[in-house]
Amino acid sequence: DVCSSDLAGVACASNVPIPGSSAITDGRAGHTLIDLGDDEYTAGRPHPMIEPAVRDAALAKALADPATGVVLMDFVLGYGAHADPAGHLISTLKGWSAEATPIVASVTGTEQDPQRRSAQIAKLEARGILVTGSNAAAARLALASVGLH
């Protein structure tokens, strides 16, 4: 529970019901967790696991915002998932610098998945994305990168 335990006492807003968080408002202040797979972003469109382009505009906006301290992402592999989610992300990162805004990621899948977990991780790491072994570890690293854990 990122907002109520790891960020105790720190303002946190989200578009999904996370214990300890408030709803996102237009005048964002503090830390924000946005689930781009939520119905709000996928209505009439495929989930980002299937079509990662669904999150391209929101990601570009976050990376262009000097107030963004870190971007936390997860990639889910398997049948029905995008053929190359890491490759898609990398193709959208023209001009991105890990020093400016780090991206922390986790990859859920196996070597038996069509996308091969190790191949996806290698692509992300080669581009400077910090990859952890689980989404919980990625959340902790994202918190640490902005001095909160």
Regions found by a protein language model. Give the residues of each.
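Active-site rim loops that border cofactor/substrate pockets in soluble metabolic enzymes
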Residues: 15-67, 75
